């Protein structure tokens, strides 16, 4: 029962991490305008994400434009795209494997493959969380380095957007949930197709012979020397 509760908790955390990873991938709030220097008072803010860049006006109007060229994008943005897409795909595969492998489901019940699916789902969640963590950490490091670069004008500096914070939280949930899924299957006994033989039955013990009454041994006695002599044959003939 305890391992089932751990599996449910791990799956719930991992599922929340998967949803957060999807939202992080879609949102354009990876970089936002840094209000420093001459940009302290401005009516326009710029947002940059993996797929589009947006302009936010003080009137509450958003204007977004999708990146039209893939090769014109910087390499760090292309790498972040690839990592986040792979992370989302792995999270979906991990969710399917975990549903099959959990004890509370009927899929593959009573087979050794059920535990294998649960461990595989946990491992895929771990890998997905790691890829998401690498992507958001790489982008955060790039934003911080550009922000403290004195050669860069203040109009080209950006701050950490809300999507990066969500990415850190989502990747942490995926890592924790995947770890719980893997640990919940660690203490289970291996599958055996036949019931194990008891220790008492494995050792052979000598059993006493069955009791027979004395009358049963009367006909089994060997003939005496006297009876053999009276039968017409002498014992000396056989020597």
UniProtKB/Swiss-Prot annotation:
Tissue specificity field: Expressed in all sensory epithelia of the inner ear vestibular organs, as well as in liver and kidney.
Keyword annotations of the record: Cell junction, Cell membrane, Membrane, Tight junction, Transmembrane, Transmembrane helix
Gene Ontology MF term list: identical protein binding; structural molecule activity
Membrane topology, as annotated: Multi-pass membrane protein
Cellular compartment(s): Cell junction, Tight junction; Cell membrane
GO BP, sorted A to Z: calcium-independent cell-cell adhesion via plasma membrane cell-adhesion molecules
Residues passing through the membrane, by range: 8-28, 82-102, 116-136, 163-183
Main location: other
InterPro entries on file: Claudin, Claudin_CS, PMP22/EMP/MP20/Claudin
All ranges on the Extracellular side of the membrane: 29-81, 137-162
One term under GO cellular component: bicellular tight junction
Cytoplasmic side: 1-7, 103-115, 184-239
Gene3D superfamilies xrefs: 1.20.140.150
Family membership: Belongs to the claudin family.
Function: Plays a major role in tight junction-specific obliteration of the intercellular space, through calcium-independent cell-adhesion activity.
UniProt name for this protein: Claudin-14
